[in-house]
Amino acid sequence: MKVLVINDFARKGGAEEVYRTSVDVLRAQPGVEVATFDERAFALTQGGAARAWNAPAARALAAVLEREAPQRVLVHNYHNLLSPSIVPVIARYKRRTGCRAYLTCHDYHLVFYNPNLLTYPRGRATPLPLDALARGTRLFERSSPRGALHDAIKKLHWHAIDALVQPADAFDLLLCPSPYMRDALARRGIARTALLHNPVSTALTPREPKCAERERLDLAFVGRIDPEKGLDEFLELARASRFERIASVTVYGDGGQRALLERKYAALIAAGQLRFAGRLDHARLFVALREHDALVLPSVWAENAPLVIVEAAMIGLPVLVHDIGSLSSFGDEIGNKIRYARNGASLAHALDALRTHLREPRRRYDWSLYTRRHYADRLAALLELSAREARELAPQCD
């Protein structure tokens, strides 16, 4: 059997890591050949028009489908570069050959104008509640931070694609990395879904859960320093509490908001309560993180499958997470999450719970659903790569 795996980019972020992992684990399956299609397969065209409808990408994909003749097509991301132009190409090939097609839902572009499920009332990034997806009033939610005209054009394009291309209908099964994504699709009437947890990096060496007795905790933030990541809001809460339960926050990463935060919280930096460590490679990062008591994940957008929760568990650390969107439910079975709401009382309660958690020497974290082996077995079953896996698929689908 031959599988064609498709993604916008070869290397960029988390979705690309999952793309490459899916290729590797499928190639390791007996009797399976794998071909790939991404940015390297055609001449890149710059500009917004190409992103809206990338005709060169569609023509290149049609040629690859004819040449490779796959029985399965697995798509990761397409709307950032390949564009919706490739969806009719896949649909036509399916109708002609009986091939089965699958989409891994790395973001929310099938259900809302903003793929991060964000709105911008008064310019402030705010997550859209899932129940709003079923209401017509979502049309009036500002989905872009770039102004009313850009927002209107974005919505017009989204509705045109939804009506004319119907991307959700082109795939036999939508693979959801989190229960929250599955629920979001269900709110828009999309039920052909199955859970497929993204795999965590195999480069990590598992460590025993860390214990700490101190009253004031040493926290670490990992990721892009951008508004939707919520670092500013978390630091505001911590500063308002005079860092009563927090000894320090170390920020690993970079981004467009870093300079602003360095100015805004200069007093915290001078006092040694806030430190910007910049970007580190994975090997150095996970060694450095082990020196902290816990990670903080303060995102103000819904997220989808924040693997930092799993990675923290693997190196023995708990995570203080903003109780919002997918963060509220993703990884609950692992046992290393402490939730907080965006107010001082909730943060204080969560920090007290975190201190108690860190003092429990017998605690254990379970990340078995996020291993490469589990991902490989589940993906093979969902793609029905053998008769046995096809028989086993029904009880596994959600």
Question: Predicted regions span which residues?
Answer:
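A conserved mid-protein helix/loop that constitutes part of the nucleotide-sugar donor-binding site
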Residues: 17-21, 217, 221-240, 256-260
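Membrane-proximal helix-turn-helix segments that form the acceptor-binding/catalytic region
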Residues: 109, 121-173, 183
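Carbohydrate-associated surface elements
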Residues: 180, 199
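Nucleotide-activated donor-binding/catalytic signature segment of Leloir-type glycosyltransferases, i.e.
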Residues: 262-280
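Acidic donor-binding loop of glycosyltransferase active sites
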Residues: 290-304
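Short hydrophobic beta-strand element within catalytic cores of glycosyltransferases
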Residues: 309, 318-321
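Conserved acidic donor-binding segment of nucleotide-sugar-dependent glycosyltransferases
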Residues: 336-345, 353-357
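A charged, aromatic-enriched C-terminal amphipathic alpha-helix characteristic of glycosyltransferases
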Residues: 358-390
